[in-house]
Amino acid sequence: MSGALTHDVVIVGGGPVGATLGALLARQAGPSGAARVLVLERQLPPPPDPAAPVGLRVSALSRASERVLVAAGAWPAIAATRRSPYERMHVWPEGGTPRGAGSLSFDAGELSEPDLGCIVENLLMQHAALGAFRAAGGTLATGELAGLGFDAQGVDVRTTAGDYRARLVVGADGAQSIARRLAGLEAQVEDYGQLALVAVVRPERPHESTAWQRFLGAGTLALLPLADGTCSIVWSLPQAEARQRLADEPAEFSRRLTAASDGVLGTLSLEGERAAFPLRRLLAPRYAIERFVLVGDAAHVVHPLAGQGVNLGFLDAAALAEVLARARAEGEDPGALRVLRAYERWRKGDNQLTSAAMDGINRFLSFGRGRVSRLAQRGLGWVDGSAIAKRLLIERAMGLSGDTPTLARRRAG
């Protein structure tokens, strides 16, 4: 192709992170007018149906992510459809109790916040972000990436939807990123040998807008409260055991799940289908080359135990949007490696730190019973008794501390 530029930025992947980045960029104005942004997505999500059951794939959005979605123009559609704020969280290891010694509890009131975050379906986030992107004047193409051709002036983007030429291509197409592979960037992948089993269950007792997380010898169990009184579960198990739980009759599944939860909410009854996906840790050693950059799961995948995966992706989107806005204001080429390395330096260290922390916490707290478990309980108990340590953890989880992008610090409204 190697002709005239058709777009300033082409984003490969229109999931929640890619679509949000697209909306942020499309809303930017510069001396030459609005940025020309195209998002390429393989398959568009169906319109959300508030009457339909809650989807199996959900995310725990931090306060910082909420602010990024507000800046992108996507939050009103989410707030108007279905979201589930949670106000408290209890964490405890096997051998302990959820509110006893050796547990860790968080309360939004400790930060004078209305909640710690909210549970939102991934498809709803994606639909809202794509809607905001189109409303901002972005171009949405449905198709698959077929090739990338780089030269000094731009990138030829070959897709099943047509061919484009851009100054910058962003890989936002997830852990199995085709864009990353075509750009020649590597990824270090570690398989945990586990599956994350997801389902929606109805607890016997009210969940009290509280998230519950129990570390077990064979994995972790998270109960995420939903606005209709049900809970979304994420239960990480060794692969063979997870497959058995998928095949269990509902009554047997309920019995085993209730036991794994330590009966904290009484009997947990299955509602609807179950699904599972493999757990892997992924880190890209490099995020950027000339005219190409990675965001979200294409750059990093962390253990889901703290729900930080999509939140890291939204921080990537906000940081890249800020770096590109600065470059645009200064008349710089958005695809220049110097510009993209500024984003990489900003986000890679934080993402690697979070990944290592999630990996370490999971390994340390998932020892079941015994000496290591008792040490874990003492550690959790110490943090729970230290107002300073606890506040630092809450602020970190909510995205309220550290070198966060301006859009993530800006309060809604």
Residue spans for each PLM region:
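Conserved N-terminal helical subregion
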Residues: 3, 81-182, 189-195, 404
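Beta1/beta-strand and adjacent pyrophosphate-binding region of the FAD-binding site
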Residues: 3-17, 38
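Glycine-rich FAD pyrophosphate-binding loop
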Residues: 26-55
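Generic enzyme active-site microenvironment
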Residues: 39-40, 171, 295, 302
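N-terminal FAD cofactor-binding segment of flavoenzymes
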Residues: 53-95
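Conserved FAD-binding catalytic core of PHBH/FMO-like flavoproteins
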Residues: 69, 162, 169-267, 271-274
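FAD/FMN-dependent oxidoreductases across multiple families
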Residues: 243-337
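C-terminal helical "tail/cap" subdomain of flavin- and related membrane-associated enzymes
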Residues: 322-413
